[in-house]
Amino acid sequence: MSGAVCPGSFDPVTLGHIDIFERAAAQFDEVVVAVMVNPNKTGMFTHEERIALIEESTTHLPNLRVESGQGLIVDFVKARGLTAIVKGLRTGTDFEYELQMAQMNNHIAGVDTFFIATTPRYSFVSSSLAKEVATLGGDVSELLPAPVNARLKAKLAARD
């Protein structure tokens, strides 16, 4: 049985992320989305909210589950008996960074990373950009899963 992890902060999860999850789920028997804890970052959504939003947005993927993760991703992979890391790539800049990470993960733990090129319609989408546009009053409904868009609107309305 093959299993892979899709790690990230997902603050919030976007349709670009969902696209990568769907494509990974088609290639691996089991996919775990690891919502990584970063004590140096404060996000718009709490860690628990991010996990819940991904769960709500991926109910159509029976071989995918969402977990909290922290520390080295290779330790997460090994502890769960998974075999690979999956990362989405939007640009050459993403590739340069992710290639270094992939090589380090292979060096320290022998874990391979599989890269999935983002579908062109999502190639410009990032969590940061979606939050920025929404904060300035723009419509991001075509960039985010419906539950995420609704929760983002509610958070922004509560700030006003």
Curated annotation (Swiss-Prot):
EC number: 2.7.7.3
Top-level class of the enzyme under EC nomenclature: transferase
Cell compartment(s), UniProt: Cytoplasm
Pathway(s) the chain acts in: Cofactor biosynthesis; coenzyme A biosynthesis; CoA from (R)-pantothenate: step 4/5
GO biological process: coenzyme A biosynthetic process
Main location (coarse class): cytoplasm
SS bonds (residue pairs): none
Residues reported to bind ATP: 9-10, 17, 88-90, 98, 122-128
Residues carrying the site annotation Transition state stabilizer: 17
Superkingdom per UniProt: Bacteria
SUPFAM superfamilies to which the protein is assigned, alphabetical: Nucleotidylyl transferase
Cofactor(s) the record lists: Mg(2+)
Binding locations of substrate: 9, 41, 73, 87
GO molecular function: ATP binding; pantetheine-phosphate adenylyltransferase activity
Catalytic activity: (R)-4'-phosphopantetheine + ATP + H(+) = 3'-dephospho-CoA + diphosphate
Record's keyword annotation contains Iron: no
InterPro entries (UniProt xref): Cyt_trans-like, PPAT, Rossmann-like_a/b/a_fold
Record key words, sorted: ATP-binding, Coenzyme A biosynthesis, Cytoplasm, Magnesium, Nucleotide-binding, Nucleotidyltransferase, Transferase
GO cellular component terms given for this protein: cytoplasm
Recorded coiled-coil stretches: none
HAMAP family named among the record's database cross-references: PPAT_bact (MF_00151)
Family: Belongs to the bacterial CoaD family.
Quaternary structure, from the entry: Homohexamer.
Known function: Reversibly transfers an adenylyl group from ATP to 4'-phosphopantetheine, yielding dephospho-CoA (dPCoA) and pyrophosphate.
Protein name (database record): Phosphopantetheine adenylyltransferase
Native organism: Mycolicibacterium vanbaalenii (strain DSM 7251 / JCM 13017 / BCRC 16820 / KCTC 9966 / NRRL B-24157 / PYR-1)
